[in-house]
Amino acid sequence: MKIIIDGDGCAGRDIIEKVGKKHSVKILIYCTINHMINSDYSEVRMVDDGFQSVDMYVANNTYENDIVITQDYGVAAMALGKGALAISPRGYIYDNDNIDRLLFERHLSQKNRRAGGKSKGNHKRNKEDDDRLYYNLEVLIEKVKAISN
């Protein structure tokens, strides 16, 4: 098990590293060369600044029972398809019961924006998001530990 962070624009990294350290779980952060990320705990891997470069590196380096942290539903779907677990930086767990709906809603929002419509953005990150991320990341790590034993 390792934690893989889609690092371009990932809030909550301090919480993720705190939980990772607590459980001695290796953390990999993938980001483009345009995002300078420094960490005393996580291994930062820089990738080219191409379209969806980080997404493809995350997907290609994810294996069964890894935990992927991403706000991208497509990356989450690829991780789930490989037998990994996925969670958003706000602490929402992606699973096989909700990923299809989330992808469909994303499609509808994109279609609406292309037609000139507006879509509502995310709310400002708050303590509830931090608490949810901490708690649900703990849940996922314990789930993987239970599967592995």
Curated annotation (Swiss-Prot):
Membrane spanning residue stretches: none
InterPro entries: UPF0178
Superkingdom assignment: Bacteria
UniProt record similarity statement: Belongs to the UPF0178 family.
Protein name: UPF0178 protein CPR_2251
Lineage: Bacteria, Bacillati, Bacillota, Clostridia, Eubacteriales
